[in-house]
Swiss-Prot record:
GO molecular function, one term: RNA endonuclease activity
One BP annotation, GO: rescue of stalled ribosome
Protein name: Ribosome rescue factor SmrB
Cited HAMAP family: SmrB
Superkingdom classification of source: Bacteria
This enzyme's EC code(s): 3.1.-.-
Keyword presence, rRNA-binding: yes
Family per record: Belongs to the SmrB family.
UniProt cross-references to PROSITE patterns, sorted A to Z: SMR
Every Smr domain range: 92-167
Enzyme class: hydrolase
Amino acid sequence: MLEPDDIALFRGAVKGVKALKQDKFIAPRQKMSKKKSTLRDIREKEDTLFYFSDEYEPLLNEESAVRYLREGEDSHILKQLRRGDFSPELFLDLHGLTKEQAKIELASLLQACENEHVYCASVMTGYGSYILKRQIPRWLVQHPKVRALHQAPKAWGGDAAILILFEV
């Protein structure tokens, strides 16, 4: 609390000050309603979810480290991802989520990366029963904005995480 001397000093400093009457300025109404905003977000997520098919089986080597490079990209990018030269700006932790919940969260991450112009993100799948660890790369390779992905280096999660490089 304040000391009595401090209170007296403050009162002496503001003595004679009059409160302003607010009658001239009217705050502008907010242009966009919350309904429209959430509707737009839902549409963007649906657009992103469009790319995630559970039936698609890409040619990924599931016995070694997870990695993918989009056709036409420089192979040096995979080496940079493996070494941790790209540091992720956004992180997504999927521990404890179901496959459907993970798909929605992954779509949200991709949309956030696109909206915020983020070029690298990390998805933590965890160890668990390996369902998400196998499925996440299958979904990611279907998205046109994903340039490359690789199992994260130990500093960013190791076996339990995937680094993703996006087209910005």
